[in-house]
UniProtKB/Swiss-Prot annotation:
Originating organism: Bacillus anthracis
Any Pfam family the entry gives: RsgI_N
Listed Polar residues bias regions: 219-230, 411-428
Cellular compartments annotated: Cell membrane
Biased amino acid composition, Low complexity: 240-251, 282-328, 336-358, 366-408
Membrane topology: Single-pass membrane protein
Protein name as it appears in the record: Anti-sigma-I factor RsgI
Reported induction: Part of the sigI-rsgI operon, which is induced by heat shock.
Length: 441
């Protein structure tokens, strides 16, 4: 069947003809007589397929290309893998590893310039297991002389999913044990997303950021001052020790409560010493007297007397007397010697004959020709002889007598009589009589 059409294109062996139906048909060329735009007649059997045909040898290659495109489209349309945790590796180069739920590395970022140098040298890290990538980072840091013997590897894990923390911790501990055998220190710690964000803003790794913050906190918080046992001991020693000397004398209070009225009136009497009377009050006193009588009462006092009579009263006192009469009485002791008597001590009383000495706390001396009253809070009565009183004592004497009482005092008297009363005193007297009585004798 013959068809007609207008020649639209002329090729070497064929021509393209436009049919009245608007179709383009390629048919064999007949000689060189046809021209473009000329209407020609052609047979349908001579018509060539106008569809595009692929050569036979290209068909396998085209099939491979088609498969590649399909695979590319498939992976392209897949959703991006989710990051479940970050692990910061800080040596001097700092890098951050992003891992999936099964701890595959899907991203690796450098946190500083040294980290970028290491990252450029790392190859084939993507989709590798976390342990393998960390080993690669440590090895490359050793090769580049970043990791030396005086440095350590700090691993900081930040898990988005709390369920992943035990798995991360297990991997980190295995790495720590592995590198301990290689004499490389590996430290592991966990952190939070907020700390990671602060580290990113500071441009450093998370582990380095935590270390710097800890150092700042230590510098701000002042160390607690440890208690110095030496200073505490000095403070305890500086406090007044409770001793029998400091404890208020309750016995004196009791004595005052039950004292007779005449004794109370006698204690109120305060007499000023005459020209020949001298009183010295203080601890550790030393007195020397050359006269008729001497009394030595005071703590740790020493007295020498060359007269007729001497009385030495006090604690642990020693007396020597070579005179007419001497009485020495300690605490609670009583001495009675004929016409003359001296009684010195706490709460002691001595009364005999014409002469009497009464020395002690709250003690009183009796009126007579001679009287001595020595002790705390004691009073001496008017007489021919003198009574010597210790701490806080009052003494009245209108005779040729002298009282020397007190700590650390030194007095000298040249007269008829001298009284010195105290603790631990030593006296020597060369006269007519000597009496020495110690405590509780």
């Amino acid at each position: 069947m013959m068809n007609k059409g207008i020649v639209m294109d002329i090729k070497k062996h064929s021509v393209v003809v436009l049919t009245p139906n608007g179709e383009f048909i390629t048919c064999k060329r007949k000689g060189d007589s046809c021209m473009i735009g000329e209407e020609i007649s052609f047979d349908e059997q001579e018509q060539k397929a106008s569809r595009f045909s692929i050569p036979y040898f290209l068909k396998p290659a085209s099939l491979l290309v088609a498969c590649f495109l399909c695979a590319l489209l498939f992976f392209y349309n897949q959703p991006e893998e989710k990051v479940f945790a970050y692990v910061s590796v800080d040596i001097n180069p700092s890098l951050e590893v992003s891992v999936t739920k099964d701890l595959r590395v899907i991203d690796l970022q450098a946190c500083n310039d040294d980290g970028r140098r290491i990252l450029k040298e790392l190859k084939q890290w993507e989709n590798k297991q976390l342990q393998e990538v960390i080993r690669t980072i440590i090895k490359q840091s050793q090769e580049d002389k970043y990791l030396t013997n005086d440095k350590q590897v700090m691993l900081t894990a930040i898990a988005k999913d709390k369920l992943l923390e035990p798995k991360l911790e297990k991997v980190m501990k295995e790495l720590k044990k592995e590198y301990e055998l290689k004499h490389i220190t590996v430290e592991y710690q966990s952190s939070t997303m907020q700390v990671r964000e602060n580290a990113i803003k500071a441009g450093i790794g998370t582990g380095v950021y935590i270390k710097q913050e800890n150092e700042k906190n230590k510098s701000v918080t002042p160390p607690a001052t440890p208690s110095n046992p030496v200073e505490n001991e000095e403070e305890r020693q500086s406090q007044p020790d409770s001793s029998p000397d400091v404890v208020p004398d309750l016995s004196s209070v009791k004595d005052k409560k039950y004292e007779k009225p005449e004794y109370k009136e006698q204690k109120k009497i305060e007499e000023q010493p005459t020209k020949q009377i001298k009183e010295n009050n203080g601890r550790g006193s030393q007195q020397e007297n050359r006269g008729n009588q001497q009394e030595n009462n005071g703590r740790e006092s020493q007295q020498g007397n060359n007269g007729n009579q001497q009385g030495n009263n006090g604690r642990e006192s020693q007396q020597g007397n070579n005179g007419n009469q001497q009485g020495n009485n300690g605490r609670g002791s009583q001495g009675n010697n004929g016409h003359q008597q001296e009684n010195n001590g706490r709460g002691s009383q001595g009364n005999n004959g014409n002469q009497q000495g009464n020395n002690g706390r709250g003690s009183q001396g009796n009126n007579g020709h001679q009287q001595e009253n020595n002790g705390r809070g004691s009073q001496g009565n008017n007489g021919n002889q003198q009574g010597d009183n210790g701490r806080g004592s009052q003494q009245g004497n209108n005779g040729n007598q002298q009282g020397d009482n007190g700590r650390g005092s030194q007095k000298e008297n040249v007269g008829n009589e001298q009284g010195n009363n105290g603790r631990g005193s030593q006296q020597e007297n060369r006269g007519h009589q000597q009496g020495n009585e110690k405590k509780n004798q």
